Amino acid sequence: TDAGGMTCHASIVSRELGIPCIVGTKSRSHEATTSIKEGQMITVDATNGIVYDGVLEDVVKPAAPQEQAVVASEYIPVTGTKIYMNLGDPDLAEKYGVLPCDGIGLMREEFIWTTFIHEHPLHLIETGRSDVAVNTLAEGMRKVCQALAPRQVVVRLSDFKSSEYRDLKGGDKYEPHESSALLGWRGASRYYDPKYTPAFKLELEAIKKVRNEF
């Protein structure tokens, strides 16, 4: 991506999935997404922020194998400060649920929307498929809660920007074009807006379903 850093969504999701990701590539008004052509061979030093033209064989080394998360065999002391993890992908809950943490401090809902649902919530309502959102959200939360039980899981309800909601199927019809989407119609200001409240209720129904049925 041209913008972003170690804590942006692209970085977080890529780390969870174990895939390479280069963010924040804009330099001196040049953007990598436009400067680097399709099929062009380059070497990227992501640690130092350097891009070399062509393949530099002397600096290209095979990546070390990634080790899976395991439970430490030694005694884990109880700390005065609770240790929580962030998790976006429900399919990774079992893998990381075995770690000696106190629970999930932040489970982002957005990953479920973009990876499993793909459609704007208001579009689902208009087409009579509200249950798709409710059931898919609930199933994602169930996986995480089940893997971490009886530890606490904190779910953050959707916090997409209008530009991100617009990328979902049907989103063009419902989303405004804002000069600064980062500071625009998102979060709580969206939840209680009459134009979006029906969609917000789908998220609440999913939470209710998890608590009552699972």
Residue ranges: model-predicted function:
Residues 1-107, 115-120:
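Acidic, glycine-rich flexible loop/linker segments
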Residues 65-214:
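Conserved alpha/beta-domain cores
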